[in-house]
């Protein structure tokens, strides 16, 4: 049930007045001056801004405040969404994306003809081909108006996905599923896992979008695990659970993102039934999470077993060439909105070399440059390092030194570092020395001869014997295994 438009605008005016009082006039003008109310339903408020950068900033810094203020206006509000104006979503047929040369918005569609839904996140893993004015709309759902899908961002397509060695196999499997549909049973279910910001969401949404383009009437649903839980809980509350489950079982392709967040015994039980029904009916299922199926310990064992029965593919961090291509595309996208933007190729290359973490870290770096460029147009590489130091440090591997390992092991076993380097063969010295050699081999790139030299000029065979000795003991000695884990944590904490 939607609020009357006049009432909605009055509520929005009251909210913006409160917001301005809370954050101050200067911050309000900078970040909320172009905020507009798009829609208010029974439990969801949708606000819009003109750019993806504004949306990301508001979502990252003011989402909780906006939700709090709207709930003061209406306690029934459960969620506040901030979207980019002119970009919409979701589950049935996809309109072709427009380029920045043809970015005029299409004529409005009446609510009876189409249902338009909010977009997902912007740059979120390797999704850098933003296109203004593009739209993905959904055919009206059943007479109840029920909508199954989570936001599907039209910028997340195979064309805008930056491929490379770290994701090429997963991309090939994703394309096969999107093109072959239910005939791609050898990939069923397909499970894609990766750390945050490496392109899982982009890849999953690209599958859904391509499947819709391939077959206009395809029954495709993209869901996040959290959205599934929310919809299921809402359906139970409204005595509509049976209808909700029947709708989900009557689809051709189910795409589930962030599976690690699926919680609750009853909800997992229902999801297990859904998974079994779809797989047994040769319907395609694609799932993504931040770890492999076997490591999702919070999931019901039956769900894990089903997920392990398909193909699991890992997406790794992007290499330098991929990172540079992401930045180039992101700059081209930003220039569609502001042609005066100019970040030199040498700056982009430097950022690609130094920010080696996830795509989201790369986006954060780019947004920093974009923000600074407006009042520091001739930014230098030294200044870039200063601005992005927190990101470059986070992306660098920790440097672990053998001397630090020796110091921490000696302190733990209450011996001196000189004892570790000496020729003494007493039991109280031999064990710590072997542990230190083992950790040096496991935690540093040093060769066996180099480690031997650092331990009083010992031969490499002595180091090899120590490593094998500890490896043999650790399987049967729980106390030793715990000691090694503790020592590893201490060493990592001290690493630069």
Curated annotation (Swiss-Prot):
GO biological process terms on file: DNA replication initiation; regulation of DNA replication
GO cellular component, one term: plasma membrane
Record region (Domain II): 76-150
Region (Domain I, interacts with DnaA modulators): 1-76
SUPFAM superfamilies hit by this protein: P-loop containing nucleoside triphosphate hydrolases (SSF52540), TrpR-like (SSF48295)
InterPro entries (UniProt xref): AAA+_ATPase, Chromosome_initiator_DnaA, Chromosome_initiator_DnaA-like, Chromosome_initiator_DnaA_CS, DnaA_C, DnaA_dom, DnaA_N_dom, DnaA_N_sf
Location of this chain's protein in the cell: Cytoplasm
UniProt family annotation: Belongs to the DnaA family.
Subunit comment: Oligomerizes as a right-handed, spiral filament on DNA at oriC.
Annotated protein name in UniProt: Chromosomal replication initiator protein DnaA
Organism: Brucella abortus biovar 1 (strain 9-941)
Gene designation per UniProt: dnaA
């Amino acid at each position: 049930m939607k609020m009357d438009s006049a009432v909605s605008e009055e509520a929005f005016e009251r909210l913006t007045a409160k917001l301005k009082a809370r954050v101050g006039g200067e911050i309000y003008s900078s970040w909320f001056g172009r905020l507009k109310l798009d829609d208010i339903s029974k439990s969801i408020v949708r606000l819009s801004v003109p750019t993806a950068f504004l949306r990301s900033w508001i979502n990252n810094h003011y989402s909780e405040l906006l939700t709090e203020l709207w709930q003061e206006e209406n306690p029934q509000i459960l969620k506040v969404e901030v979207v980019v104006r002119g970009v919409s979503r979701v589950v049935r047929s996809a309109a072709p994306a427009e380029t920045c040369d043809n970015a005029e918005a299409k004529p409005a569609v009446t609510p009876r003809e189409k249902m338009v839904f909010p977009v997902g996140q912007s740059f979120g893993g390797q999704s850098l081909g933003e296109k203004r004015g593009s739209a993905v709309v959904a055919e009206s759902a059943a007479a109840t108006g029920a909508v199954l899908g989570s936001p599907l961002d039209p910028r997340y397509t195979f064309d805008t996905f930056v491929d490379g060695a770290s994701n090429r196999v997963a991309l090939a499997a994703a394309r096969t599923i999107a093109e072959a549909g239910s005939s791609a049973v050898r990939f069923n279910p397909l499970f894609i896992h990766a750390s945050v910001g490496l392109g899982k969401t982009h890849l999953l949404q690209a599958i859904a979008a391509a499947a819709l383009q391939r077959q206009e009437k395809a029954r495709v649903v993209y869901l996040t695990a959290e959205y599934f839980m929310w919809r299921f809980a809402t359906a139970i509350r409204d005595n509509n659970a049976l209808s909700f489950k029947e709708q989900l079982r009557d689809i051709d392709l189910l795409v589930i993102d962030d599976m690690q967040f699926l919680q609750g015994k009853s909800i997992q039980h229902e999801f297990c039934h859904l998974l079994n029904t779809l797989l047994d009916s040769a319907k395609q299922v694609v799932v993504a999470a931040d770890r492999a199926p076997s490591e999702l310990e919070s999931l019901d064992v039956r769900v894990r077993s089903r997920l392990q029965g398909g193909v699991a593919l890992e997406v790794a961090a992007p290499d330098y060439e991929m990172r540079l291509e992401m930045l180039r595309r992101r700059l081209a996208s930003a220039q569609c909105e502001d042609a005066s933007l100019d970040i030199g190729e040498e700056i982009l290359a430097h950022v690609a070399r130094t920010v080696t973490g996830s795509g989201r870290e790369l986006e954060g770096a780019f947004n920093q440059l974009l923000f600074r460029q407006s009042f520091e147009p001739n930014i230098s590489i030294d200044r870039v390092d200063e601005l992005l130091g927190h990101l470059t440090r986070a992306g660098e591997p920790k440097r672990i030194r053998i001397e630090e390992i020796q110091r921490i092991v000696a302190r733990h076993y209450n011996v001196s570092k000189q004892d570790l380097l000496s020729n003494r063969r007493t039991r109280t010295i031999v064990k710590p020395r072997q542990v230190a050699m083992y950790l040096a081999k496991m935690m540093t790139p040093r060769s066996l001869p180099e480690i031997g030299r650092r331990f009083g000029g010992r031969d490499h065979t002595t180091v090899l014997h120590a490593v094998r000795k500890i490896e043999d003991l650790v399987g049967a000695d729980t106390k030793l295994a715990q000691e090694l884990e503790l020592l590893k944590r201490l060493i990592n904490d001290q690493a630069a």
